[in-house]
């Protein structure tokens, strides 16, 4: 989202607070909060349990994070989707920490005890991490090497390239959540689509109608890569092709690199067609 905020903090500057909601929520849990940190007892700001974002957090995992923000120590609610990345920063992503439902043989460690354990873990690490704040909640706490590739910037680059290569392109459908974004576009290029349809039929297919498109997918909460994948709708059935662009959320990856890769989309469609033609001309005795 355009109003996302990324901040970088030292892991050992963070502390975790767990507010229990089971079997009963007690408001005093949200006041006079103290954590043991580096041999000292550190006081933290109160949590306004009537605020909607805080209430939702308490009803979900109950995990809050405290860290330096805007010149002071702030405490913020976390989303459920952030939990796995938080425990990874503490190198404590085990079943005991990740379990939130009991089984016949395994019980759940209360969230306040998980938080105490996380705070102790955080103190052992002096690396930095990247915190994603979205709509007043923490959506992810990722490693220092995580490359921030804003989805809205990538979408703009893709649409500009599509407008250059396929001026008649249209948006087809998509999905969006705090975890994931997917958008599919139809290129509406009759000449190219007809050429590919004929290639499929030469290979033994019985394709009457064919539409070509591109699927874009990414995530800001730890998904390893950005993808732009080619697909065809053959007789109304959508099929992914082998050709695709991918860029890891890691190291020196940038939106400029993605922009450069997008210039190869036209070549990838052509290579897919040539691959089908090659298969059509392959003698099974040679396989």
Language-model region placement:
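Feature for intrinsically disordered/low-complexity regulatory segments and propeptides
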Residues: 1-157
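Intrinsic disorder/low-complexity polar-acidic segments
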Residues: 148-287
